[in-house]
Amino acid sequence: MKDLLNLLKNQGQIEEFDAIKIALASPEMIRSWSFGEVKKPETINYRTFKPERDGLFCAKIFGPVKDYECLCGKYKRLKHRGVICEKCGVEVALAKVRRERMAHIELASPVAHIWFLKSLPSRIGLLLDMTLRDIERVLYFESYVVIDPGMTTLEKGQLLNDEQYFEALEEFGDDFDARMGAEAVRELLIQIDLEHEIGRLREEIPQTNSETKIKKLSKRLKLMEAFHGSGNLPEWMILTVLPVLPPDLRPLVPLDGGRFATSDLNDLYRRVINRNNRLKRLLDLSAPDIIVRNEKRMLQEAVDALLDNGRRGRAITGSNKRPLKSLADMIKGKQGRFRQNLLGKRVDYSGRSVITVGPTLRLHQCGLPKKMALELFKPFIFGKLEMRGMATTIKAAKKMVERELPEVWDVLAEVIREHPVLLNRAPTLHRLGIQAFEPVLIEGKAIQLHPLVCAAYNADFDGDQMAVHVPLTLEAQLEARALMMSTNNILSPANGEPIIVPSQDVVLGLYYMTREAINAKGEGRVFADLQEVDRVFRAGEASLHARVKVRINETIKDRDGSITKNTRIVDTTVGRALLFQIVPEGMSFDVVNQPMKKKAISKLINLCYRTVGLKDTVIFADQLMYTGFAYSTISGVSIGVNDFVIPDEKARIIDAATEEVKEIESQYASGLVTQGEKYNKVIDLWSKANDEVSKAMMANLSKEKVIDREGNEAEQDSFNSMYMMADSGARGSAAQIRQLAGMRGLMAKPDGSIIETPITANFREGLNVLQYFISTHGARKGLADTALKTANSGYLTRRLVDVAQDLVVTEIDCGTEQGLHMTPHIEGGDVVEPLGERVLGRVIARDVLKPGTDDVLVPAGTLIDEQWVDFIELNSIDEVIVRSPISCETRYGICAKCYGRDLARGHQVNIGEAVGVIAAQSIGEPGTQLTMRTFHIGGAASRTSAVDNVLVKNGGTIRLHNLKHVERADGALVAVSRSGELAVADDFGRERERYKLPYGAVISVKEGDKVDAGAVVAKWDPHTHPIVTEMKGVVTFVGMEENITIKRQTDELTGLTNIEVMDPKDRPAAGKDIRPAIKMVDANGKELLLPGTDVPAQYFLPANALVGVADGAEINVGDVIARIPQETSKTRDITGGLPRVADLFEARRPKEPSILAEISGTISFGKETKGKRRLVITPTDGSDPYEELIPKWRHLNVFEGEQVNKGEVISDGPSNPHDILRLLGVSALARYIVNEIQDVYRLQGVKINDKHIETILRQMLRKVEITESGDSSFIKGDQMELTQVLEENERLSAEDKFVAKYVRVLLGITKASLSTESFISAASFQETTRVLTEAAVTGKRDYLRGLKENVVVGRLIPAGTGLAYHSERKRKRDAEKPVRVSADEVEAALTEALNSSGN
């Protein structure tokens, strides 16, 4: 019996739960929560401050105001616990029960819940199949609705206004039932027979033809099934009982002066209670219908305002004219419950202060002001003082600390020893924004920060502040030390390169000490060892830059760990020999035998990490920093006005450009060039002039003349301070130097267009008033952009984190063979990213074979490290298939093999790593560096001139890819396809460069030809789009009638006449439907066919085409018969920077997307409609042709009779990612999105590993759309989680039933976040009301799989060290499953026990 009582006691406390369910509350449920009914609107007696009985703060209902004390004071203290006072009716208990005890209000008339009414789509409306307006008219007492038509001609659900209602009453008397208000709607909802309706809808859907109707029906069906499956009843959406929030959650606080500060909810509840009581009274008095009706409507409005103020009509405002904060407002938005209190909380044991530089610290240390340390570690100090017996009580210890006695400082030092603290700088954009350090006590009030971690924090010392947090528990200290210590975070999680890299003065110092100078003091000396170099340098006998010979001993550690020692004499400089002293053993001397620029230093640290490991790298980084500081001090590099050397050629270049501009102006004045052409030419001219000036300036700055030892004149790299700063990468760039000593160049107007007159002056010469004024545009725009950008970038990061937060590595290997095709990323002829770089840290999906043989070079399942990369380069492998997050088949989470290397650690990723969040941070963190437009250069405009040829950069063999071409009489090839590419391969067959060839390009080489570097292999006219013949024959004009479809134009300059096809808009009525074309016939006038088809050879001419041949002319293969001018002056505004990244991740459909071929086949054109062309693709296999209507103004890339492949571009424009996924599949989509996003980041010089983008993409591809439901319960057109469909299909195929068929769907990140399985995560992201409404109706369960959900319920997250806790919990639970008891079993056991004891 005793055990049973314990069991019952434990039933009340829910500690262990696996899921959270949200559902509609039935009236019984609400009453069961309640501790009594609130009957009066009174709150607190203003004189006694005691709660009024039966009011909103009633102590009888909600519990005592003071701990263990009833209201009248009869029972006090703990011994009366649980007694209910007979005088005031209050139970003696803790006062905090007032935070959990609820009450209720019995409503005199039912009221609709506004969320289920107004949150779109309206759930009540969908169930009743009525429009929202109709339902509102019923609820707010404007119309009657027929509930039971009886034997009359009325229909159920029909709306009647007052007149119609009274007419019907006269006609039918009491045979029918029509009412208004929420009661009527409730009655209709009660009458719904869900099972019957579901069956009816399931039958109706397959028989319907119209798409819209099917959509509507399946929406209803889904909702009905949701109600049916969740155990919610439809009538529960209408409230008959209203729950009242516990009073301590809506406090009322007396202020001095007899006023009260109160929560808005109290006002809203008061309003409801007042109206409810008034309505009860009116009903008792059986008042006239119209008055009762008005009161009911007011009650409905009061409840609406309480639940969601402002959702319908005007928001109810308080005394201060502000809208009152309703229950819905409490939970949504940045200040709501989810984001303010559940996902983010305030922390104790923290402090903040200004940071300052700590050049003497080691990498794992930070300087903590004594004052701060004393405050932060107080409890530890108290404990220690007591333990030592220095203080008898905590109070005494407190006094000692307050007096700051000397022994307190000793204790503090002891407490702090090896107790790491966390330093955080806001904004924390990635995980390196919080790192752990060992504190070093310092005087002063500023925190000292190690200079090398500034890059990770993005900190500088111009007044930045940082926060300090103390990890208290042993576990927290352990994690801080093992995972968050600054020494463990040398590599950036975004790209796997060192982030602990010297910058600014350290770089300058190292660069200065490793530069060489001709004829410096001590040149030509030979030294026996490094120590001798050191001595001679210290004695002042040799300059830092002197070229000398040194004998060095080096220990070289190979990749495989073998160590070789050797001694050799090297040509080097004194400075480099000194630098080699601090390089760790195992590194070759060659790494420092060069000027140490920023890139070289970064490479050096990276190499050091891969060769000798973490510990030595950390020590080395510190040494580099100390050395750099020392030598930049010695160097004395400063900047003075005479460092800005202006090139002598500047005046000449500018004069020449001005002359040419005058020439163009005069051409424009005499009407030879148009305004647009003039503008373009002038801007091109000035761009070129600017480049020339900056070239001359850099040539001038970067070299200087000196006399060498023999007395001859020699040239060496300049020691100009400004040049050294830029060249070393310490500060500044060529673009900035150009503005200081070259010319500022072209400027942009606020609307982004470029001003024709450039600023020819530079800052050294000074700007005149006009020039200064032009500059202000860019500067102001830069500042405005920066402010906007920060907010936008933060929002992008938030969306990314939200979509990827539940992606965690959950297993080692999912066993898939799928993967992505990797090739080197080639752009405009340059290898932007070699294959080795792209596959580094990835796992190979299928064996890599030696080119041309079956020998396996790299077996599948290999994790590619630096050694393998060299091997791949060596064997000139061109393509590899690698595992990718996108193709990973793990159900929940992702597997380690598909992810590959953990970039921040350099080995295969651990189970439990939260790769989704890392990906989101890596992409979001550089967001603030991306442009809206450029900022630092001050809006100086940049423009490139149009490309019109292919110039080969490396010699090699020509390869033509995907190129359809015809051969001209002179042997040149003419491209007649759009997607053709020309590549140059080296002797190993590795691709070195690749170029796109536009339609009509004339190619002067053939497949397999050898070319030398610098050869021009293809040419085209960038300003026109040609139409090329594919055969020899005679031209005949079809439908080309002068001034009806064509007009002849005479060129004023040359006197030649051109035939121009008129735009259909400008044609007379007779010519609207005529399609001008050029037909090819043979010498006898017989129609020629296109080669390989039975389509007659005729070329239709689009509007504005210029025809270049005469009727009846003989032409050859590859001749251009017409040209279509392309507008280049109005360059299409390409969205760049942050907005472009956001568009790609949101998977937005571009405005005028490129049109892709839906199937493979032959192109023809059908009958035209108004403003549209009908494009027909006839498949080669004889199945049904595909038709599409395309607007006339779209320029088509295909001609009648051309063969296209599925997914080929028919009309140019920005690509639509949804089309790519549908026609070309997931890996083509991945390639497109990864490349597009990388292009934006690459432009800013930001490196992000591809797999981060793929990780986000995996989350965007979670959903599938059902195309055939098979034997599953899915409905065609439903969007489901891929994992759900796969599980269902596995079950079906096990039972030998038909599986559901589906297609993958791409969702934007916002949509993907909102449609995740976890409603807690979705609700805390955006659109809280909508998410919760939907979740409640469907009775959703949240299985707490992601990180956010667990943070909200206050658990450890299922990632990292928390994963162990979760799997342990699961293991324990599985072990003790049978012990769990249901409530029914308890009841049965109880009755049995009672019966047996009764006997």
Swiss-Prot record:
Zn(2+) 2 binds at residues 814, 888, 895, 898. Mg(2+) binds at residues 460, 462, 464. Gene3D superfamilies: 1.10.132.30, 1.10.150.390, 1.10.1790.20, 1.10.40.90, 2.40.40.20, 2.40.50.100, RNA polymerase II, clamp domain, RNA polymerase Rpb1, domain 3. The keyword Transmembrane does not apply. One of its GO terms (biological process) is DNA-templated transcription. One of its GO terms (molecular function) is magnesium ion binding. InterPro entries: DNA-dir_RpoC_beta_prime, DNA-dir_RpoC_beta_prime_bact, RNA_pol_asu, RNA_pol_N, RNA_pol_Rpb1_1, RNA_pol_Rpb1_3, RNA_pol_Rpb1_3_sf, RNA_pol_Rpb1_4. Its cofactor is Mg(2+); Zn(2+). DNA-dependent RNA polymerase catalyzes the transcription of DNA into RNA using the four ribonucleoside triphosphates as substrates. The RNAP catalytic core consists of 2 alpha, 1 beta, 1 beta' and 1 omega subunit. When a sigma factor is associated with the core the holoenzyme is formed, which can initiate transcription. This is DNA-directed RNA polymerase subunit beta'. The lineage of its organism: Bacteria, Pseudomonadati, Pseudomonadota, Gammaproteobacteria, Pseudomonadales.
